[in-house]
């Protein structure tokens, strides 16, 4: 009887949840966002070095 009640309650919780509230979806979106952030930081770091070199040239002139 406990198993049946637990199954029914959990089924209702799953069915009443909004489609956008998926826990796995949030994890996947977070991982993608984190990967893009890290990639952007790496790419911006290379641009930062180039900008520093240009700034040194501008000051020297």
Curated annotation (Swiss-Prot):
It is found in: Secreted. The keyword Secreted applies. The keyword Secreted applies. Keywords: Antibiotic, Antimicrobial, Secreted, Signal. Residues 48-61 form a propeptide. It comes from the Eukaryota. Residues 1-22 form the signal peptide. GO terms for cellular component: extracellular region. GO terms for biological process: defense response to bacterium. Antimicrobial peptide. Belongs to the pleurocidin family. This is Pleurocidin-like peptide WF3.
